[in-house]
């Protein structure tokens, strides 16, 4: 097997050097114990990834406000704990992550309106928060509408003072990650969570400093990046994951590229391209399948078209592309053709935490056999009949943990 471009080191803008370009992308672990701090189960999972030979590991999303979680078992910044208590817990986690030299980043998030009932400490009668009071649309029909109303409710619009508080919560979480010994953080601005809700006109109808124009919709994210940067040294890695947009809608594409101009100028070290929301879970399904073999590149690299646009507009910014990759050849093609600098692998990494060593960079494994296994589980018939897209997706098996 010839040397792969994906196996070559890459140095990010902050000076952090990754030993290769294969990244364990973020996945919500969903096993946090009460208190939202990492326990032995979390450390055991990351101990496996630390041995895998990944270029970088990005943790599952850690919520910056434990009142609002994406699932009831998310890790979060525990509001009941002091900074020193959190650092003591996170330091044990970070020590496991870096024991084999793998750079590990903590992904920071706020779920916004995508906080299901019972997740977090905000109480059953307290509404979720969002840039604008617009509820989730989980599908057409009575059942999807009822599920949306019961599970998520209609969010309330955030006040400016609350937006500023959340901005500082991201900054505090980044400071805690730095003190704990992690190599950096990734700010989650994708998948329909709070920052993505601010970026998108459909979910942000504000007319103040945080909405009404492309630039003002990006203000929340830019303020977060600036606040994070003020709390950590320049050598501490700060990345952003952001949603792809469909290039068939030129005005939306222009808006997103403009927002990325602001993001790159704010001082991020890399950008990750992903996609999907609870309403439209492209992160699981990908875009519509190609109709011909000539377009098979898109059957694996879900968001490759948008990634190519971003790569051409911002050639000096390392680009991480995540979503759909299932074989060595497609990963190598994405890196060599300039679509991205790095490739993110999520669910196959749960099935095989040692994937870089045992498959991707194993010279004894032929290209034809170098597949990234991720079995599918069909949603039960009754769930599929409900018409709720997010429940009907093929959920991959991550029970290997």
Curated annotation (Swiss-Prot):
Coiled coil: none annotated. Gene3D superfamilies: Aldolase class I. NADH-dependent flavin oxidoreductase; part of the gene cluster that mediates the biosynthesis of ilicicolin H, a 4-hydroxy-2-pyridonealkaloid that has potent and broad antifungal activities by inhibiting the mitochondrial respiration chain. The biosynthesis of ilicicolin H starts with formation of the tetramic acid by the hybrid PKS-NRPS synthetase iliA with the partnering trans-enoyl reductase iliB since iliA lacks a designated enoylreductase (ER) domain. The cytochrome P450 monooxygenase iliC then catalyzes the ring expansion of the tetramate to the acyclic 2-pyridone. The keyword Phosphoprotein does not apply. InterPro entries: Aldolase_TIM, NADH_flavin_oxidoreductase, OxRdtase_FMN_N. It holds the Pfam family Oxidored_FMN. Belongs to the NADH:flavin oxidoreductase/NADH oxidase family. This is NADH-dependent flavin oxidoreductase iliE. It comes from Hypocrea jecorina (strain QM6a) (Trichoderma reesei). The keyword Lipid metabolism does not apply. FMN binds at residues 25-28, 107, 346-347. One of its GO terms (molecular function) is FMN binding. It is an enzyme of class 1 (oxidoreductase). Substrate binds at residues 188-191. Its EC number is 1.-.-.-. The gene is iliE. It comes from the Eukaryota. Keywords: Flavoprotein, FMN, NADP, Oxidoreductase.
């Amino acid at each position: 097997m010839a040397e792969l471009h994906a196996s070559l080191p890459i140095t990010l803008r902050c000076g952090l050097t990754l030993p290769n370009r294969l990244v364990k992308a973020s996945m919500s672990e969903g096993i946090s114990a009460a208190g939202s701090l990492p326990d032995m189960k979390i450390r055991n999972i990351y101990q496996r990834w630390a041995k895998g030979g990944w270029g970088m590991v990005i943790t599952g999303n850690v919520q910056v406000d434990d009142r609002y979680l994406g699932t009831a078992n998310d890790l979060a910044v525990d509001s009941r704990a002091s900074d020193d208590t959190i650092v003591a817990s996170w330091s044990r986690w970070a020590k496991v992550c870096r024991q084999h030299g793998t750079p590990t980043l903590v992904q920071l998030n706020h779920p916004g309106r995508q906080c299901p009932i019972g997740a977090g400490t905000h109480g059953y009668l307290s509404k979720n928060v969002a840039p604008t009071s617009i509820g989730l649309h989980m599908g057409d029909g009575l059942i999807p509408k009822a599920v949306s109303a019961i599970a998520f409710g209609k969010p309330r619009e955030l006040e400016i003072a609350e937006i500023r508080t959340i901005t500082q919560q991201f900054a505090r979480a980044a400071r805690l990650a730095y003190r704990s010994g992690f190599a950096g953080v990734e700010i989650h601005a994708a998948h329909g969570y709070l920052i993505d809700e601010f970026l998108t006109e459909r979910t942000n109808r504000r007319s103040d400093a945080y909405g009404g124009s492309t630039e003002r919709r990006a203000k929340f994210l830019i303020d977060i990046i600036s606040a994070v940067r003020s709390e950590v040294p320049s050598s501490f890695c700060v990345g952003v994951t952001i949603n792809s947009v469909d290039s068939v809608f030129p005005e939306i594409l222009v808006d997103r590229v403009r927002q990325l101009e602001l993001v790159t100028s704010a001082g991020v070290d890399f950008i990750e391209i992903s996609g999907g929301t609870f309403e439209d879970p492209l992160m699981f399904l990908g875009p519509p399948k190609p109709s011909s073999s000539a377009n098979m590149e898109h059957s694996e690299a879900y968001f490759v078209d948008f990634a190519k646009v971003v790569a051409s507009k911002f050639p000096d910014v390392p680009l991480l592309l995540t979503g759909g990759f299932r074989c060595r050849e497609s990963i190598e093609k994405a890196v060599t053709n300039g679509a991205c600098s790095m490739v993110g692998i999520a669910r196959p990494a749960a099935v095989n935490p040692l994937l870089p060593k045992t498959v991707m960079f194993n010279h004894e494994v032929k290209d034809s056999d170098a597949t990234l296994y991720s079995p599918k589980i069909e949603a039960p018939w009754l769930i599929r009949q409900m018409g709720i897209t997010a429940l009907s997706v093929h959920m991959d098996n991550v029970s290997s943990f």
